[in-house]
Amino acid sequence: MKTQTALFFFFLFSLMVATQSGVVDTLKNLLMGLLSKRALRNQNFVEYAYDPSLSAADWRALDTLFENY
């Protein structure tokens, strides 16, 4: 009986902390941000990753700069 009471109060306290700190709202907003129509529709951000103006020497220089970063 002591274990059940301790677990009950632990989960009750956890629920109170989660609702007061806004964890549930943060998780909901994160999921909606990842799964919303706008997020699913806006998948063309990868197009900007390729820059044809950079030469092989530029890529090597960038590689050496970020080698120890």
Curated annotation (Swiss-Prot):
Antimicrobial peptide. This is Peptide Ctri9594. Its main location: secreted. The keyword Hydrolase does not apply. It comes from the Eukaryota. The lineage of its organism: Eukaryota, Metazoa, Ecdysozoa, Arthropoda, Chelicerata. Residues 36-69 form a propeptide. GO terms for cellular component: extracellular region. Shows a low ability to inhibit hepatitis C virus (HCV) infection in Huh7.5.1 cells. Keywords: Antimicrobial, Antiviral protein, Secreted, Signal. It is found in: Secreted. Residues 1-21 form the signal peptide. It comes from Chaerilus tricostatus (Scorpion). GO terms for biological process: regulation of defense response to virus. Expressed by the venom gland. Belongs to the non-disulfide-bridged peptide (NDBP) superfamily. Short antimicrobial peptide (group 4) family.
